[in-house]
């Protein structure tokens, strides 16, 4: 297994807003350089350019719409976030759910603009369906565990291992991330042992009093 991929989602936490978005990204970059582990961040949309301009690491959008240029007031246009410095995007996070048609349209737009795409799912069947669309990653996150502090890798390990198995049968090129309740080194280790290639996490790092120390704890068993 290669080095895991870690994506830190800032959500709309005040600690990850504005200057805080840059400060946390700098902590991620430092830990990434020291460990050799790829760590990316997903700040709020208005902070994408700020973070991408000030810190050399992969920046993801928390959402994008499957639309093109034109009369789409309030939508998130893939070309715009790409030119702001985004490297990729989340699609269908449980806090920003989409219909199947919208997921497919967003993924198509992400590919059109050269953005790495992560489709979020909540169980094995939806993970299998997402894998059939061929994103770069699927991220399995049971919504009831998000922000709970209870890692999915312990609360429901079968949903992780089952997702990994389902994806490998449909398209082994699609990588699987594990999310929900991930915050400590044991959580990441368990997620990797279940076959995932990395994790999607948020509050355990963003809201920590010392995000750098929290990241160092997260990767200590890798």
Swiss-Prot record:
Q: What is its EC number?
A: 5.3.1.1
Q: Where in the cell is it found?
A: Cytoplasm
Q: Which Pfam families match?
A: TIM
Q: Which domain of life is it from?
A: Archaea
Where on this chain does substrate bind?
9-11, 146, 181, 202-203
| UniProt KW keywords | Cytoplasm, Gluconeogenesis, Glycolysis, Isomerase
> Which residues constitute the catalytic centre?
93 (electrophile), 141 (proton acceptor)
Instruction: Give the first-level EC class, as a single word.
Output: isomerase
Q: Which reaction does it catalyse?
A: D-glyceraldehyde 3-phosphate = dihydroxyacetone phosphate
User: Among the entry's GO cellular component annotations, what is one?
Assistant: cytoplasm
For molecular function, the Gene Ontology terms on record are: triose-phosphate isomerase activity
| Annotated metabolic or biological route of this protein | Carbohydrate biosynthesis; gluconeogenesis; Carbohydrate degradation; glycolysis; D-glyceraldehyde 3-phosphate from glycerone phosphate: step 1/1
InterPro entries reported for this sequence? Aldolase_TIM, TIM_sf, Triosephosphate_isomerase, Triosephosphate_isomerase_arc
- Intrachain S-S bonds: none
The alphabetized list of GO BP terms reads: gluconeogenesis; glycolytic process
**HAMAP family in the record, alphabetically?**
TIM_A
Assembly behavior:
Homotetramer; dimer of dimers.
Q: What does this protein do?
A: Involved in the gluconeogenesis. Catalyzes stereospecifically the conversion of dihydroxyacetone phosphate (DHAP) to D-glyceraldehyde-3-phosphate (G3P).
Its recorded name reads: Triosephosphate isomerase
- Please spell out the taxonomic lineage of the organism that makes this protein: Archaea, Methanobacteriati, Methanobacteriota, Stenosarchaea group, Methanomicrobia
């Amino acid at each position: 297994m290669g080095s895991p991929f870690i994506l830190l989602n800032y959500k709309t936490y005040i600690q990850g807003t504005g200057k805080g978005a840059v400060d946390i990204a700098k902590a991620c970059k430092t830990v990434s350089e020291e460990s050799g582990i790829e760590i990316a961040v997903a700040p709020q949309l208005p902070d994408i350019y700020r973070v991408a301009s000030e810190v050399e690491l992969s920046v993801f959008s928390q959402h994008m719409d499957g639309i093109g240029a034109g009369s789409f007031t309030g939508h998130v246009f893939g070309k715009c976030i790409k030119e702001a410095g985004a490297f990729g995007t989340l699609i269908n996070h449980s806090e920003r759910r989409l219909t199947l048609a919208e997921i497919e349209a967003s993924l198509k737009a992400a590919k059109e603009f050269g953005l790495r795409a992560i489709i979020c799912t909540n169980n094995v069947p939806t993970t299998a369906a997402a894998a059939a669309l061929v994103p770069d990653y699927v991220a399995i996150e049971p919504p009831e565990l998000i922000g709970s502090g209870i890692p999915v890798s312990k609360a429901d390990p079968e949903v992780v291992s089952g997702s990994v198995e389902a994806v490998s049968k449909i398209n082994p090129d699609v990588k699987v991330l594990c999310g929900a309740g991930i915050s400590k080194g044991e959580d990441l280790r368990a997620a990797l042992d279940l076959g995932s290639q990395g994790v999607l996490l948020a509050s355990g790092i963003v809201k920590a009093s010392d995000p750098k120390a929290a990241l160092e704890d997260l990767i200590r068993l890798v």
